[in-house]
């Protein structure tokens, strides 16, 4: 790799905001928040969805309530 053209690649801790689970990995992402992990301090990056909470990886299905949208459409435009 050419020196001086790549972003800083360092260890960071990602936290899933849904489950609260944290994991240590390497990233170019930075944060002012930090967390202690096994006696060392690392930047903390929060993510709404990770493999720990994503429906594809967990096998859980989330039902999307589209019935409310259909009823709203029918009230507004009626049935023809």
Curated annotation (Swiss-Prot):
This is Large ribosomal subunit protein bL31B. One of its GO terms (biological process) is translation. It holds the Pfam family Ribosomal_L31. Coiled coil: none annotated. It comes from Mycobacteroides abscessus (strain ATCC 19977 / DSM 44196 / CCUG 20993 / CIP 104536 / JCM 13569 / NCTC 13031 / TMC 1543 / L948). One of its GO terms (molecular function) is structural constituent of ribosome. NCBIfam families: L31, PRK01678.1. PROSITE patterns: RIBOSOMAL_L31 (PS01143). Part of the 50S ribosomal subunit. GO terms for cellular component: ribonucleoprotein complex; ribosome. Keywords: Ribonucleoprotein, Ribosomal protein. Belongs to the bacterial ribosomal protein bL31 family. Type B subfamily. The keyword Ribonucleoprotein applies.
